[in-house]
Amino acid sequence: MANFLNRYIMRHLFPVFLLIVVGLLIAPFLKAQSHADKILKDEITSDLKENILSFWEKYSVDPSGGFYGSLGRDGAPIADAPKGGVLNARILWTFSTAYRMYGDAAYRKLADRAQRYFIDHFIDPQYGGVYWLIKADGTPLNTDKQTYGCSYAIYGLSEHFRATGNNESLQKAIELYRTVESKIKDPVNDGYIESFTREWGTPQKLGYDGDGVATKTMNTHIHVLEAYTALYKVWKDDGLRERLAKVINLITTKLYNSQTHHLILYCDSNWNNLDDIDSYGHDIETSWLLTEAAEALGDPEVIGKCRKVALE
């Protein structure tokens, strides 16, 4: 059942999150250079506010706390569905970004609600890190630690601080960053291990769905990159800067095939390639994440390198 729910969340809710991201990131930057450009900008902004954000604002709030773990196509809540750490971190990021961009008090209210619930229910107060799933009542269900989930937590909390100035969000993001570096980073070969038990031991199965075969994955590393970029934008720490630069280097050297110009999806702990699958969607996503990270660092040499890889 847990595996089914994990797959459902990733396959059905992830595309919705991508639509939100595209709308939030593109809408402000579409300059009305022509009548057609203005029409496109207005359509994207309207769709984002009236069809996407409004849907989640109307249907996702759980009166008993936080947000429902799953909704039907008509918005009807599945009240007993478990709540995912990644979904809730994305809700936190989404409404924080929406508030920062549009200044709507309703978005601020939802962002604050998501922040409070996430900190109180998803962050492990004993061992650190983020639970993968909690029950509908907010108690832990799957306490495994997935690096992917911890990364999204840093991403969402950093954005909440950026949007609202809430220092608790920044401090929690910093704590999670330090946990990732102390518990998840490979001390021998660098990079970030995929999965752990609650106590940071080796899990019986790898990956968020338990079907993973790789100790290190491209997907996890690009979201560590994304999280560290978001945190560095609001916390100019020298150690974080060094690690952000290192993650950029790992992606462009260990997880990028310079012959095929595709990403390497799955590796063992020594960075040996475990498969020859190409993922065009992740290639596109990473091209943007790399350039964003490089621009956050502000190093012309790194920016040039990342733009070259992105265009290849």
Protein language model regions, located:
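Bacterial Sec-dependent N-terminal signal peptides
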Residues: 1-35
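Glycan-recognition and catalytic cores of secretory/periplasmic carbohydrate-active enzymes
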Residues: 33-312
